[in-house]
């Protein structure tokens, strides 16, 4: 399964099955490896989140402690629960331990390269459950589309750097509460810490840490993620933010879809890697 990078990638206040209330709907344009941009739409509710791309959808239900990865073309979905994720993490930890044993017999230089590659992917025995994120100002304020933002280089523990242009939440008409489900999704996925699921700084969004470093609560209007090997580059640009009711059933599995196991080979969306949070 491919990781959600989220845009990442970004992202309703609706009460399922009852009267519609205003939601936060964030629309992004994401380009992978220089290809034409594709739309990514995020719907945010207090404890619900949906990230949609042309190929896949990811639905986070904080009220149920579940994530669904939905593939409309297959009429199928994968369900992630804390119990299932703990099982997956144990399996991946075992695989990484076997990899470490094989690496022990490698020539020093080759072993060093492998260790660096795994660390860059947020994997390995020393990978932190919650990566440390550092923001370094990288230029003067500028305009990206209709938004004013300040450039920052964003680095994660033992990982590659991303280029962000960050606007203040107030300038975007957002509050921390609007992004509450986005933060909740990142915390949910942190249960897979050390397995490479949190390669995007946005997947570990911490407003307190961000404000302490850059001086304000912000959100990226432009991100650029480049993998160390140069084979995976993701550029994401914020197009619009609206407060409106999302379509009925936005946070539910479509009727008639079949549940598949994690091993069924379904790819997941990701902003920077499907739907993704900003990288």
Regions found by a protein language model. Name each.
Residues 21-279:
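Extended soluble regions of mature proteins
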Residues 17-18:
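N-terminal signal peptide c-region/cleavage motif recognized by signal peptidases
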Residues 1-8:
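Bacterial N-terminal signal peptides that target proteins for export
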